[in-house]
Amino acid sequence: MKVNNIIKLMSFAAVAFIATACSDTDAQYTIPEVGAPEFVAATPESDADLLFGEQTFTVTFDKNIGFATKNASQITLNGVPVKSALVLGASPSLTITADVDFSKTQTLVIPAGLILGPQGDAYDQEIKLTWTLDDLPSNTAVAMTQKLGWGWNLGNHFDTSGDAISQGWGYWDRATPGAELFNSLAKAGAKTVRIPTTWTDHMNDNSVISADYLNEVAGVVDAAIAAGLNVILNTHHDSFETDLGNAANPEKKDVAKADSALICTLWTQVANKFKSYGEQLIFETFNEVHAGDNWSGGTAEQYDMLNKWNQYAVDAIRATGGNNATRWIGVSGYAANLDLTLNNLVLPTDPANRIMVAVHCYDPYGFCLAPVGADGTETYSSWGHNADPAYSVPDANEEYVIKLLYKLRKKYIEQGIPCYLGEYGCVVHTTDNANAFRKYYLEFFCRAAYMAGIPMLVWDNNSVSCGTVNGNECSSYFDHSTGAFVADGAEVVPMMIKACTSTDSSYWFDTIWSKSPTVK
């Protein structure tokens, strides 16, 4: 190889000398590159997280290279031939497209002799590149994930918002939650219950919350804690929840002032009521704050105002002292939307450094919350790699779910900031086949959350029709009074708990993938 290269260099030098001597111009000559290329680098870099799905790799050398595309099948990722490999124009880089599987370690192998230099000299070494997903770190965020585990929402029991109809507590579920319910939850394997609560409808003209109402809420909190459950208590559908657009309008400063004052006085009263409660109680500043009917996103001014509201709430809670000085507090971004929270939430300043991030995720929306169309038939009846393209949400399969939740891991969990899914779920569908896909989705989604280190609380609205008349809004797992399983809760709840808590390393995505139903 070396002798051949020396001969080439001598021949080239002679030709160059003759050409220069015979020329009567000032023309410049480019000396062509010779010799075999040398490997320089690859992207993604070795510390990158390669998640399931299609991935592009770029392998770069020290000079322009040649590659016969017919040899692409000899390049493998985890032993499987890549989808494509080519050099784009005159370039020192080989671009490879391959499917990343569920393995924690990905190994890309380019056999020796496939990469050629400008003069046909081959790179004579095998290139072997590996990427390994790190295990979850040992930090405060992961410890909180283990503490919260799998959880459940009391739905709209204390939700008194809505139209002009007088809605007292329990209007939506007509239940009396107590020891029987919470003991059943604990026995099933739940660790946390979220109690969504509307407060402003129980205030007098001086913004004082009814003592009877405070006691009623406290009684339910007490029953849950007595059963050994953690409790997340929030503000839910209060008067300011959809008023963000007005509060952020610079021409409506009076609205901003009034809403801010209301938030402070509300949280001061709630925090004082529970200031002696221990670590099992967690506060959550807001539910899904947004502007009017705009759920898809707001303006920079609205995001800024919501960040201020979170700070006001945290300050009000901390100022009450007692155990509230160090109590964990959950905060969320616009509409509690995952991406909007990631992109726009500014964590409040907190002397206790005990702030968690709360997000909600019902993705893909059509399959999870609104599968039934206006004609009563299912528009979205399947999900995942075996779904019917005509009856599923496009580009929202297993790959989408894994990457969606992993963003929370990178932004929060790996940085030691606890994060939880305050709401998730998928309504009971109207056909057996669609419900088979629903169960597959729930198991896969829960396992993806486990991989990301995210605890989760399923939404349960105690829809009495579940199991008989299913479809949109049918989200029931436990009877809100007795704690008995409803609909398919007895089957689905243990499955979800296992998926989001099991430490069995053999229980991985490929195990669930193989159980995917097919369209019938």
Task: Set out the residue ranges of the language-model regions.
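An active-site-proximal structural segment forming one wall of the substrate-binding cleft
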Residues: 173-192, 203, 207-236, 241-285, ...
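N-terminal carbohydrate-binding accessory modules
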Residues: 135-192, 207, 411
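Active-site region of glycoside hydrolase catalytic domains
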Residues: 261-395, 406-426, 451-454
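Acidic, Ser/Thr/Gly/Pro-rich low-complexity segments and short DxT(G/T)-type signature motifs
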Residues: 24-46, 112-136
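Substrate-binding cleft of secreted/luminal carbohydrate-active enzymes
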Residues: 398-485
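Short, surface-exposed alpha-helix to beta-strand junction/turn motifs within ectodomains of secreted
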Residues: 53-86, 113-116, 127-132
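C-terminal motif of bacterial Sec signal peptides marking the signal peptidase cleavage site
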Residues: 18-21
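Acidic/histidine-rich helix-loop elements
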Residues: 154-177, 205-209, 247-257, 366-400
